[in-house]
UniProtKB/Swiss-Prot annotation:
Residues 8-74, 85-151, 171-237, 277-343, 377-443, 479-545, 555-621 form the HMA domain. Mg(2+) binds at D1292, D1296. It is a multi-pass membrane protein. GO terms for molecular function: ATP binding; ATP hydrolysis activity; copper ion binding; copper ion transmembrane transporter activity; copper-dependent protein binding; cuprous ion binding; P-type divalent copper transporter activity; P-type monovalent copper transporter activity. The ATP binding site comprises residues located in alpha-1 and alpha-2 helices and beta-2 and beta-3 strands, which are involved in van der Waal's interactions, and Glu-1072 which forms a hydrogen bond with the adenine ring. Cu(+) 2 binds at C182, C185. SUPFAM superfamilies: Calcium ATPase, transduction domain A, Calcium ATPase, transmembrane domain M, HAD-like, HMA, heavy metal-associated domain. It comes from Mus musculus (Mouse). This is Copper-transporting ATPase 1. The keyword Signal does not apply. Disruption phenotype: Cell-specific silencing in motor neurons is associated with loss of motor neuron cell bodies and progressive denervation of the neuromuscular junctions with aging, consistent with the clinical features of human distal spinal muscular atrophy X-linked disease, 3 (DSMAX3). Keywords: ATP-binding, Cell membrane, Cell projection, Copper, Copper transport, Disease variant, Endosome, Glycoprotein, Golgi apparatus, Ion transport, Magnesium, Membrane, Metal-binding, Nucleotide-binding, Phosphoprotein, Repeat, Synapse, Translocase, Transmembrane, Transmembrane helix, Transport. Its main location: Golgi. It is linked to Defects in Atp7a are associated with mottled, an X-linked recessive condition characterized by mottled pigmentation of the coat, defects in connective tissue and neonatal or fetal death. It is due to a defect in absorption and transport of copper. The mottled mutants exhibit a diversity of phenotypes. Two of these mutants are called brindled and blotchy and their phenotypes resemble classical Menkes disease (MD) and occipital horn syndrome (OHS) in humans, respectively. Other mutants are called dappled, mosaic, tortoiseshell, pewter, etc.
Length: 1491
């Protein structure tokens, strides 16, 4: 039956649907339209897929029909897809009861029938149907008088059905599926998706972690399939866009029916093939393991192919087949026809089997005889976890029995296994899995060397075509590339990228650095290119960009080489090093004894280079770099300004003495003038008679000469730094504070010098009045201010300096043997540590690099990095952070991140960037400062001119208020001096520094204090924005809750003399130990803790049924119970909450403990228990009856938001376990504090509304958005922002990244050092919700301090400048220039000191708030909570349900929360942390949660 196309399919986007009723309305109305065969509407996808007759309808008419119903229909793609139709042959098997016309009319009215041809003479009908809409059996049911013509059907379609060939219009989809751990997972996915309508075939590969699905796009979409896989509990990603299949029925018919023909143009017959032959094909166009799987699965379905092995590395396939049925040419065409039709196939070799004896001439034509000369391969597998020779013997004994394994040798010292095997019977991956199944970690090597092909020698023919050809084909080259990765938020993202990239063909190793946002990938350039790798990362949902030059010379080494005497030594070192593999460049300078080397750290390390130079007879050592934080504590600047101040002070003291002397003498003369009525001439003579006023030369007095001599060194030595900075500013066409200072002092000095020279030139008898006293006093106060300012600035960076000081300077590298015994220790510089080194850290020592503990137990102080006050326990497998301090035990760690890639280095970089970033308010201050200096200069000039005018118009004002005025000076000179004094004072008192320091100093202290408390604030903008926040939105899972389920209660449902509680825990823990579900892991963890053991019994026949539960058989638990001592048993009984259904007293329970005596017999030790664990439905399926008491207990747990599961042992209901994701202890307090701060608190989650309501009631949140998809969280945050509210989003950074980025302030909570760098504005290193309160509180305190600083700065300038300009002269308020400089210095110092008050900040802690009464905290009743479901704002207030409705809803919620595949398609939530729907209960209603 060859398919034809008589129908089309179109997908139309439909907007405006709100509920299932809309879906049904559209389906009913459009389904009635003439020419529409089938319609499927998806509310979630907002689309309608319609199959229609193109002769009667068009996409445009269908779009208009939906528009007419009141919905918005959009046609994005007007090109319809053809829909497959089949032909059904019907014959009359009995006398007709209906006329042929009636039969034809009935069939044509049937949906899915596109044509009917009636043949009354042949008493038959040919009906064209759409098989996806209607089936042949349904057609027969419509017309009972007709029956299927089976002979015709078999004749037409037998071949197609037999081989399940793809049909026209079918689409093949490849999806990456994560989280699969065993074949049970693959069976679950195949069973779930295979039942979906429109899915034709599905094949799930555990090795490749992918699923290949063939489906009909008009019935189901790729997105729906993806969500169904995620509903089972496995994250899925569409790997490639779906493609239509090309291999049709005709291809398989050609394979089966094509006769054996000689090649075109061949003059002789092709050789006769024996019954069993093998041929090797060369295949071009394969890219990954998916291609290998595709070819193997396609050919293995053919009857005449007995086996096929495809090698991606060798680009070849070895096919074993029945030569009497098929030829190599037919197989070649079959491979080329396999979808996607990209393979180019050629026959590499044709051979005969040993079943016949080929002639010598035949053999000469065959280059490779694989059957008569058995082909084998050798694989080397890395095996970790072996501890002794018993492990070696165990592996060799088991693997040697596997089919196809010829020999195996396992090396304990090298942790490898070398296996020789037959590739036709097994593969390296199968052998690796077999070793892993034994409990060892097995991995295939990074493909540095190809598999070794081994064969038996042959006398007739050579085994391989040629060694050169084989070497060319199988040589593998490794390159390295760096890719910048954005969007990573935590360690889960890192693991996701590394795990998925390693699966891609041609990629050898991947190392991703979270903090640096960089991935280092080693790959085979013949197989894959960096841009393709970047595309793979983008397909995983991250941003990726190839770093072009990152890999070039990424290792740079500076060495001091001693012992060189001439140029010959230089040449010897350079030539020797450049010959080494991995060294790109080497330059040695004899004059400086330094060597500059660029190298590849993957190939050679710095210690290797130093050793090589040492072997040449020279001594090489690392150039010491300054790792101190001197640049942060401003020591250099402090020393500089202290020197400037002391120089200025040394010369200023005599100047001030002279000034004071002259002021006293002038006051004395003024008193004499007033008391004795002296004339002006007498006053002048008396003034000139003073010692300091005596003239050495005409016009040059002693006073002016001393002032000049004292002013010169201050002006040009003490003020040198000011001149340098002012020159640089003017050079770049800007003006700053230094320009004002230089202007003021230079004008005063220049004016004084010029007027003095003029007086000397004119031989004046009256000494001119100079300003030589002004520069020394100005520089003294300004230098003092700068000195104090830099001391204060050093304090602002104290936090960052502390972080930098944490970095270790040396590391102890150890060498271990194969038994992990210490061979040697070596103390090296921390810069010489290489990735993969084993480092020993003694008690009290600092961890030099990030790493993973491989041996030892200790407590580690991470307080200065994470803010966590309590030491953290470390054991093998734990990660450690560079800079943290080891406390009480020696540890061996393996370096994972070194140098600038360590977490500490990245945090230091982050804090440095934050302290140098500008807040919006600072940008305003900077803009203001840009206009400030020109404005002050203008004011100074205006002040000068105005006072000159006023002085000449009304001299009495100047005479009255000018300090030190005496009549010996002329009026003009007095006016000019007074005007200059006011002008210079304006220049001195104006201070843009205070404006410029107001924000950055506060930001530096604020971010530093935050870093010390485990709060990383990324710059001034989020620090300023956080205080404006009005709404705080919390994610649920991992933020409000812990994100991991725990056991809340265990109820024993049988008498304790039948089975004890400990025995139930031992059996349940053993059964759940094989489960990968988080609920199972929680139960296992609880059982191990209660039994105080790390090992459990044996579990066999383990089966998991998604949506229900598990079943298995458990043995070997009596020995486990025997090891439990009496003290642990008594503590368990005391602490556990045991609820007995059939009452039995406590004494009886204790006395009948099931602890087994030491003389247990072997028969008892091997007792087997049949175990069932699951929900109600699972128990009912297995024929168990649930009593009302048990049912009520489950309902009560479900009401509190817990998941309740039942336990059956040997067909008897024994226990009930309640499991929940617990709320963090500080969550309720944090919400209460935020509300008391005037903030609105909202809970947003992808979980169901019932769970969300339960969580909200416990922590006191009254507004909830439930069942919100991750993509909709962004829309919800935006919606709150459109209401005029500033939003802070708090999430764990896994699926909340888009919402964190959209919020005004994104706050990411990290666990330990897993910090969300990219998405969030604020990163909380500790997993503590009170840090959310602290971050907002710190922001408020910092912004308040910034405002206080601005008040200080503005007061000085707005009040000081008018005073200096003489505006308040009429009321007697006037300033000298030195007073202005003192005020200016005080303004800068006061601003910095004000910022330093932030160092007194103490973040709120749990204990602090617990001391205060919390009468307003506590739970909210359900009626107080407003729950909004989905993206719309439909609020669900507390429902009022009857008893029966409550039971039904709670039961359904329990089943749905336990296993998500019972949900409808529209309720599937793609949020990974919420996918288990772990409900959190109220732990305060009673005490039954005590275990």
């Amino acid at each position: 039956m060859e398919p034809s196309v008589d129908a089309n399919s179109i997908t139309i986007t439909v907007e405006g649907m709100t509920c299932i009723s809309c879906v049904r309305t559209i389906e009913q109305q459009i389904g009635k339209v003439n020419g529409v065969h089938h319609i499927k509407v998806s509310l979630e996808e907002k689309s309608a897929t319609i199959i229609y007759d193109p002769k009667l309808q068009t996409p445009k008419t269908l779009q208009e029909a939906i528009d007419d119903m009141g919905f918005d229909a959009l046609l994005h793609n007007a090109n319809p897809l053809p829909v497959l139709t089949n032909t059904v042959f019907l014959t009359v098997t009995a006398p007709l009861t209906l006329p042929w016309d009636h039969i034809q009319s009935t069939l044509l009215k049937t949906k899915g029938v596109t044509g009917v041809k009636i043949s009354p003479q042949q008493r038959s009908a040919v009906v064209t149907i759409i098989p996806s809409v209607v089936s042949a059996s349904q057609i027969v049911e419509l017309v009972p008088d007709l029956s299927l013509d089976m002979g015709t059907q078999e004749k037409k379609s037998g071949a197609c059905e037999e081989h399940s060939t793809p049909q026209a219009g079918e689409v093949m989809l490849k999806m990456k599926v994560e989280g699969m751990t065993c074949h049970s997972c693959t069976s679950t996915i195949e069973g779930k998706v295979g039942k979906l309508q429109g899915v034709q075939r599905i094949k799930v590969s555990l090795d490749n972690q992918e699923a290949t699905i063939v489906f009909q796009p008009h019935l189901i979409t790729a997105e729906e399939i993806k969500k169904q896989i995620e509903a089972v509990g496995f994250p899925a990603f569409i790997k490639k866009q779906p493609k239509y299949l090309k291999l049709g029925a005709i291809d398989v018919e050609r394979l089966k029916n094509t006769p054996v023909k000689s090649s075109e143009g061949s003059q002789q017959k092709s050789p006769s093939y024996p019954s069993d032959s093998t041929t090797m094909f060369t295949i071009e166009g394969m890219h990954c393991k998916s291609c290998v799987s595709n070819i193997e699965s396609a050919l293995s379905t053919l009857q005449y192919v007995s086996s096929i092995v495809v090698s991606l590395e060798n680009r070849s396939a070895i096919v074993k087949y029945n030569a009497s049925l098929v030829t190599p040419e037919m197989l070649r065409k079959a491979i080329e026809a396999i979808s996607p039709g990209q393979y180019r196939v050629s026959i590499a070799s044709e051979v005969e089997s040993t079943a016949s004896s080929p002639s010598s001439s035949s053999l000469q034509k065959m280059p490779l005889n694989i059957v008569s000369q058995p082909l084998t391969q050798e694989a080397v597998i890395n095996i970790n976890g072996m501890t002794c020779n018993s492990c070696v013997q165990s592996i060799e004994g088991v693997i040697s029995k596997k089919p196809g394994v010829k020999s195996i040798h396992v090396s304990l010292a090298n942790s490898t296994g070398t296996i020789e095997f037959d590739p036709l019977l097994t593969s390296p991956e199968t052998l690796r899995e077999a070793i892993e199944d034994m409990g060892f970690d097995a991995a295939l090597p990074d493909m540095k060397e190809p598999l070794v092909v081994i064969a038996q020698p042959s006398l007739e023919t050579p085994l391989l075509p040629s060694s050169n050809e084989l070497e060319n084909v199988m040589t593998s080259v490794q390159n390295k590339c760096y890719i910048q990765v954005s969007g990573m938020t935590c360690a889960s993202c890192v693991a996701n990228i590394e795990r998925n990239l390693r699966r891609e063909e041609g990629i050898y190793s991947v190392l991703v650095a979270l903090m640096a946002g960089k991935a280092e990938v080693r790959y085979n350039p013949a197989v894959i290119q960096p841009r393709v790798i970047a595309e793979f990362i983008r397909e995983l949902g991250f941003g990726a960009m190839v770093m072009e030059n990152a890999g070039e010379g990424n290792g740079i080494l500076e060495l001091v080489v001693r012992g060189m005497t001439c140029a010959s030594c230089v040449h010897k070192i350079e030539s020797t090093l450049t010959k080494h593999k991995g060294i790109f460049y080497c330059s040695v300078a004899l004059a400086t004894n330094k060597a500059h080397i660029k190298y590849d750290p993957e190939i050679i390390g710095p210690r290797d280079i130093i050793h090589t130079i040492g072997s040449l007879g020279f001594e090489a050592s690392l150039v010491k770099k300054d790792r101190s934080a001197n640049h942060l504590d401003h020591k250099r600047e402090i020393k500089q300004w202290r020197g400037s101040f002391l120089v200025s002070l040394f010369f200023c003291i005599p100047v001030m003495g002279l000034m004071v002397y002259m002021m006293v003498m002038d006051h004395h003369l003024a008193t004499l003038h007033h008391n004795q009525n002296m004339s002006n001439e007498e006053m002048i003579n008396m003034h000139s008679a003073m010692f300091l006023e005596r003239q050495i030369l005409p016009g040059l007095s002693i006073m002016n000469l001393l002032s000049l001599l004292l002013c010169l060194p201050v002006q040009f030595c003490g003020g040198w730094y000011f001149y340098i900075q002012a020159y640089k500013a003017l050079k770049h066409k800007t003006a700053n504070m230094d320009v004002l200072i230089v202007l003021a002092t230079t004008i005063a000095f220049a004016y004084s010098l010029v007027i003095l020279l003029v007086a000397m030139f004119e031989r004046a008898k009256v000494n001119p009045i100079t300003f030589f006293d002004t520069p020394p006093m100005l520089f003294v106060f300004i230098a003092l201010g700068r000195w104090l300012e830099h001391i204060a600035k050093g304090k602002t960076s104290e936090a960052l300096a502390k972080l930098i000081s944490l970095q270790a300077t040396e590391a102890t590298i150890v060498t271990l043997n194969s038994e992990n015994l210490l061979l040697s220790e070596e103390q090296v510089d921390v810069e010489l540590v290489q990735r993969g080194d084993i480092i020993k850290v003694v008690p009290g020592g600092k961890f030099p690099v990030d790493g993973r503990v491989i041996e030892g137990h200790s407590m580690v102080d991470e307080s200065l990095i994470t803010g966590e006050a309590m030491p953290v326990a470390k054991k093998p497998g734990s990660t450690v952070i560079a800079g943290s301090i080891n406390q009480n035990g020696s540890l061996l760690i393996r370096a994972t991140h070194v140098g600038a890639d360590t977490t500490l280095s990245q945090i230091v970089k982050l804090v440095e960037e934050a302290q140098t970033s500008k807040a919006p308010i600072q940008q305003f201050a900077d803009k203001l400062s840009g206009y400030f200096v020109p404005f002050i200069v203008l004011v100074s000039i205006v002040t000068l001119l105005v006072w000159i005018i006023i002085g000449f118009q009304n001299f009495e004002i100047v005479e009255t208020y000018f300090p030190g005025y005496n009549r010996s000076i002329s009026r003009t000179e007095t006016i000019i001096r007074f005007a200059f004094q006011a002008s210079i004072t304006v220049l001195c008192i104006a201070c843009p520094c205070s404006l410029g320091l107001a924000t950055p100093t506060a930001v530096m202290v604020g971010t530093g204090v935050g870093a010390q408390n485990g709060i990383l604030i990324k710059g001034g903008e989020p620090l300023e924005m956080a205080h404006k926040v009005k709404v705080v939105v919390f994610d649920k899972t991992g933020t409000i809750t812990h994100g991991t389920p725990v056991v809340n209660q265990v109820k024993v449902l049988v008498e304790s003399n039948k089975i004890s509680r400990n025995k139930i825990l031992a059996i349940v823990g053993t059964a759940e130990s094989n489960s990968e579900h988080p609920l199972g892991a929680a139960v296992t963890k609880y059982c191990k803790k209660e039994l105080d053991t790390e090992t459990l019994g044996t579990c066999t026949d383990f089966q998991v049924v998604p949506g229900c539960g598990i079943s298995c058989k458990v043995t070997n638990i009596e020995g486990l119970l025997h090891k439990s001592n009496l003290k642990i048993e008594e503590n368990n009984i005391k602490n556990a909450s045991l609820v007995q259904i059939d009452a039995i007293n406590e004494q009886s329970s204790t006395s009948s403990s099931m602890i087994i005596d030491a003389h247990l017999s072997n028969a008892v030790n091997t007792q087997q228990y049949k175990v069932l664990i699951g929900n109600r439905e699972w128990m009912i399926r297995n024929g168990l009856v649930i009593s009302n008491d048990v049912d009520e207990s489950m309902i009560e747990h479900e009401r509190r938001g817990r998941t309740a599961v039942l336990v059956t042992i040997d067909d008897e209901l024994c226990g009930l376990i309640a499991i929940a994701d617990t709320v963090k202890p500080e969550a309720e307090l944090a919400v209460h504090i935020l509300k008391s701060m005037g903030l609105e608190v909202v809970l947003m989650t992808g979980d169901n509304s019932k769970t969300a309501r339960s969580i909200a009631s416990q922590v006191g949140i009254t507004k909830v958005f439930a069942e919100v998809l991750p993509s909709h969280k962004v829309a919800k945050v935006k919606q709150l922002q459109e209401e005029g509210k500033r939003v802070a989003m708090v999430g764990d950074g896994i699926n909340d990244s888009p919402a964190l980025a959209m919020a005004n302030v994104g706050i990411a909570i990290g666990t330990g050092t897993d910090v969300a760098i990219e998405a969030a504005d604020v990163v909380l290193i500790r997993n503590d919700l009170l840090d959310v309160v602290a971050s907002i509180d710190l922001s408020r305190k910092t912004v308040k301090r910034i405002r206080i600083n601005f008040v200080f700065a503005l007061i000085y300038n707005l009040v000081g400048i008018p005073i200096a300009a003489g505006v308040f002269l009429p009321i007697g308020l006037v300033l000298q220039p030195w007073m202005g400089s003192a005020a200016m210095a005080a303004s800068s110092v006061s601003v910095v000191l004000s910022s330093l008050f932030l160092k007194l900040y103490r973040k709120p802690t749990y204990d602090n708030y617990e001391l205060h009464p919390r009468s307003h905290t506590g739970q909210r009743s359900p009626s107080e909570i407003s729950v909004h479901v989905g993206i719309d704002d439909t609020s669900r207030n507390s429902p009022r349900l009857g008893l029966l409705d409550r039971i039904v809803n709670y039961s359904r919620a329990s089943i749905n929360s336990l296993l998500s595949d019972k949900r409808s398609l529209n309720s599937v939530v793609t949020s990974e942390p919420d996918k288990h729907s772990l409900l959190v209960g109220d732990f305060r209603e009673d005490d039954d949660t005590t275990l």
